[in-house]
Amino acid sequence: MDVLSVSEINAQIKALLEATFLQVRVQGEVSNLTIHKVSGHAYFSLKDSQSVIRCVLFKGNANRLKFALKEGQEMVVFGGISVYVPRGDYQINCFEIEPKEIGSLTLALEQLKEKLRLKGYFDEANKLPKPHFPKRVAVITSQNSAAWADMKKIASKRWPMCELVCINTLMQGEGCVQSVVESIAYADSLHDTKNAFDAIVVARGGGSMEDLYSFNDEKIADALYLAKTFSMSAIGHESDFLLSDLVADLRASTPSNAMEILLPNSDEWLQKLDGFNVKLHRSFKILLHQKKAYLEHLADFLKRLSFENKHHLNALKLEKLKIALENKTLEFLRFKKTLLEKISTQTLTSPFLQTKTERLNALENALKLAHANLKLPQFGAFLSKNNQAIELEALKRGDKIELSNEKARASAEILSVDRV
């Protein structure tokens, strides 16, 4: 038996292993994962409960992965055994990697969902409210599709006042994602302009999962999330649930269903308006009756108030006239009395003058008695100074006065007088 060097034996092992295990499929758990930022190569180990084997995934193959490789994932790798002669190491040079129980597309979608969930793309708090009565709606679909024809038909029946605008878009195959993203951006660019859309509806009919899978793309999700206009996703049939359905402000099971959800039913609203009209008419009649009754009550009150004010003013005028008459009469009597006092005592002895004096005194006493017994209004009182009637305008500060009526008598001092 020939003696071999280490290099020779490793070279023979390399030739044997690489020829024998040219293509292998190996299942195990990913561990010790390292991804080089510069080269883009990924190095990791694949292990089970008893053994470990090193693996390498070079950049070109790594770029074809539809999901992110992470530690702890149960994977099936497809590749070939390669031997590094200087160290006598061997590893699996991976060409493809797939999840053990689900496909790579499914795993990639789940990872993307988690990424967008953490960014808040699915949060209800970030959803825009559905417009109540949309006037202008952008429909992103193929203008020759059955979906567009169905949507126009339903919209014309439900809410003919709404203008549907079709933005012709490639809805499957290569270039679909970019076409949809550009159409969403165009429709949303009119936001806050006179031609703004109240809603954007991304719609297409059913198809295979391969046909619909473009609507699981992150770029479409970004376009819907960043749009300032309310958006709806209406892709496929009710059983089809895509990433665009989760990100859009509202999901419809089909394009036709989108019109039923978005647009109000004009027949139902006409019935509601009829009901509102009846209620409004009834409420108006009740309100009119109440206001009429209130105005009648107010008119009666004003009439009573006017009568009472007039009565009060007349009473004040009468009282003022009585006081003026009394003052003039007393003034006249005092004048006559003064004249009589100037007459000599001898003259007063004449029977004629004696009779007149007695008559004058009798009149004065009668007037005072009438003054004492004069009936005043319940709110009034006689005003006098030094037992003589006086007008209010004649008073000055410091005067001591008497107030009296048939029930009481009071004294007072004038503190101030304001002239009107």
Swiss-Prot record:
It comes from Helicobacter pylori (strain P12). The gene is xseA. CDD domains: ExoVII_LU_OBF (cd04489). Its EC number is 3.1.11.6. Keywords: Cytoplasm, Exonuclease, Hydrolase, Nuclease. Belongs to the XseA family. One of its GO terms (molecular function) is exodeoxyribonuclease VII activity. This is Exodeoxyribonuclease 7 large subunit. It is found in: Cytoplasm.
